Amino acid sequence: EITGIAPVFADEGTVANTAGPSLTFYEASILNRAALEAIFAAHAVDVIIHFAGFKAVGESVAKPLEYYWNNITGTLVLADVAREHGCKNIVFSSSATVYGEPEFIPITESCPKHDATNPYGWTKSMLEQILSDLYTGDNEWNIVLLRYFNPIGAHESGRIGEDPKGIPNNLLPYVAQVAVGKLESVGVFGDDYPTPDGTGVRDY
């Protein structure tokens, strides 16, 4: 049981309607230094759980500059503001994409990182390095890097969960939209890729 904690969270409006009365909500971008300064000034922030960032692999290939700017610059702004306010605890949402083309499967924590295969993956890999360097330079920081694959599921209210506008970038929401009739079918393209089933589309 966790007691005596007053959670504060900031996002761009996705979950505001689901937050209970015990949460203080701010709609803000991590690129907005003034907004972050105001949040840290108003609250004694002890720990940051950092899930903010763009995350669509395919989109990152089409919009690399936007991904590097948002994910890397935003995290630098967040870390700098946190440091100024004495908050040196961060849990960072990284990604299994940092493994690139893994040497073995299933991937374990002993699997070495490889070159990422897309800009999204590179932002996560670079941020892991930046945060590791931050700790090396100042070991008062406590930094946790979470490398996971696509989490799935939704809040029971249906207000929080992956329900993308337009065509989904990940497989499960695509299948879910077919199941509820939003999309007609799941397309399978190609049959000669070097994958077990011959298809080239993977759930990033």
Positions of PLM-derived features:
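Conserved beta-strand segments of alpha/beta enzyme cores
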Residues: 22-24, 142-144, 185-187
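A conserved pocket-lining segment of Rossmann-fold NAD(P)-dependent short-chain dehydrogenase/reductase
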Residues: 60, 112-113, 149-204
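Residue(s) in the substrate-gating loop at a strand-loop-helix junction
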Residues: 95
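N-terminal Rossmann/SDR dinucleotide-binding element
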Residues: 1-47, 167
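Catalytic helix-loop patch of NAD(P)-dependent Rossmann-fold dehydrogenases
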Residues: 62-80, 84, 88-89, 98-150, ...
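NAD(P)H-binding glycine-rich loop region in Rossmannoid oxidoreductase-like domains
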Residues: 27-70, 81-84
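Active-site loop signature of alpha/beta-hydrolase-fold enzymes
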Residues: 33, 54-57, 98-99, 151-154
